UniProtKB/Swiss-Prot annotation:
Transmembrane parts of this sequence: 31-51, 81-101, 121-141, 159-179, 195-215, 218-238, 249-269, 292-312
Signal peptide: none
Stretches with biased composition (Basic residues): 333-344
Membrane topology: Multi-pass membrane protein
One Pfam match: TRAM_LAG1_CLN8
InterPro entries linked: TLC-dom, Translocation_assoc_membrane
Stretches assigned to the Cytoplasmic side: 2-30, 102-120, 180-194, 239-248, 313-373
Family, similarity comment: Belongs to the TRAM family.
Positions of the TLC domain: 116-325
Name of the protein in question: Translocating chain-associated membrane protein 1-like 1
GO CC aspect terms: endoplasmic reticulum membrane
Keywords of this entry: Endoplasmic reticulum, Membrane, Protein transport, Translocation, Transmembrane, Transmembrane helix, Transport
Length: 373
């Protein structure tokens, strides 16, 4: 994310700079078109498809005579709903940036490198915190903690409550909104491949859980993963404000490893044992049943490969830091390299994302001046 420089000159209409500076207003007008469409009978049917959740069904509650529950399933019309809430995510992104993060940046006087990373961590920490609270409330209300067998019991989980469907729609909308944000935030070309991989992994796993009717397992894994990621980005925010705050990274490193282990355990229990012992193991697209051996192996393989990739990046990052800090040096050079080591360790803290060093780890203008002096 680059720094958006405010100039006194108004850029030409429909130019790149004009769109970047006013993208929140443009998107707000587009979202208002859908909301205004609800007011007119001619356009109401089309507007409802974008604004409200689709595929609502009423099912009688088991064991309770005369009581019915309103549940949802997924379909092609969900793409329209995801598009509308993607617009909402772009607007909220701009609001957080302008009214919270930009004000903090002006007070802290960050370098260009720290500025972009502070914005990234600020946006993601807000999203992860909101998603954790929302997802945890669904888990508690549906009793997934007290009854973990429900993660695979009764599969396929074709129908799910309003809150769970809205949660998945919001997750997809947020990660799809990250694509245009690469343009709006003037992301550096060398950072785009890393961001595309990061966004693509989220969309791949969320869409997989949503389409394969593994929504319960996906919800639990997302909350677990988001909690660990929230700790990392909060630790990085505190580190940017004061470089003495480094204990948060130690806590994050421990929880990162535990999070990977818990993810693998839950996936093996649910997919490898729970679904493998289910009676209905035939592919039935009409009923949303994907419980066959090939799909189970594919699900486990994709999750295991992703977790192994994250751990490999994490271990390499930690080993690199450990070698740099523990490498023996002559006593005559220790005093000369003390300040250089401090700067290197600070860069590692700033550039780390999920245990990896990001590609925009170049020296900031401020640090260059210190070195030349």
């Amino acid at each position: 994310m680059g720094i958006r420089k405010k100039s006194s000159k108004t850029p030409p209409v429909l130019s790149h700079e004009f769109i970047i500076q006013n993208h929140a207003d443009i998107v707000s007008c587009l979202a208002m078109v859908f909301l205004l469409g609800l007011m007119f009978e001619i356009t109401a049917k089309a507007a409802v498809m974008f604004v409200t959740l689709q595929y609502n069904v009423t099912i009688p509650v088991e064991g309770v005579l005369g009581e019915q529950a309103s549940l949802y399933h997924y379909g092609i019309k969900d793409m329209a709903t995801v598009f509308f809430y993607m617009l909402v995510a772009i607007i909220l992104h701009a609001v957080i940036q302008e009214y919270i993060l930009d004000k903090i940046n002006r007070r802290m006087h960050f370098s260009k490198t720290k500025h972009s990373k502070f914005n990234e961590s600020g946006q993601l920490s807000a999203f992860y915190l909101f998603s954790c609270i929302w997802g945890a409330s669904i888990i508690v209300s549906e009793n997934y903690f007290s009854d973990p067998i429900s993660l695979w019991k009764g599969y396929p989980h074709t129908y799910f409550p309003f809150q769970m469907k809205f949660f998945y729609i919001s997750q997809l909308a947020y990660w799809f909104h990250a694509f245009p944000e690469l343009y709006f935030q003037k992301t550096k070309k060398e950072d785009i491949p890393r961001q595309l991989v990061y966004i693509g992994l989220y969309l791949f796993h969320i869409l997989g859980a949503y389409v394969l009717n593994l929504n319960r397992l996906g919800l639990v894994l997302l909350v677990l993963h988001y909690f660990v990621e929230f700790l990392f980005h909060m630790s990085r925010l505190f580190y940017f404000s004061n470089e003495k705050y480094q204990k948060g990274f130690t806590v994050w490193a421990l929880l990162f490893v535990l999070g990977r282990l818990l993810t693998l355990i839950l996936c093996v229990l649910t997919v490898g044992f729970g679904l493998a012992r289910a009676e209905n193991q035939e592919l039935d697209l009409s009923n949303g049943n994907f419980n066959i051996l090939a799909i189970r192996i594919s699900v486990l393989a994709s999750i295991c490969i992703t977790q192994a990739f994250m751990m490999w990046k994490f271990i390499n990052f930690q080993l690199r830091r450990w070698r740099e800090h523990s490498s023996p040096q002559p006593s005559s050079q220790r005093k000369k390299t003390t300040s250089a080591k401090g700067k290197a360790s600070r860069k590692e803290k700033e550039n780390g994302v999920n245990g990896t060093v990001t590609s925009n780890g170049a020296d900031s203008p401020r640090s260059r001046k210190e070195k030349h002096s």
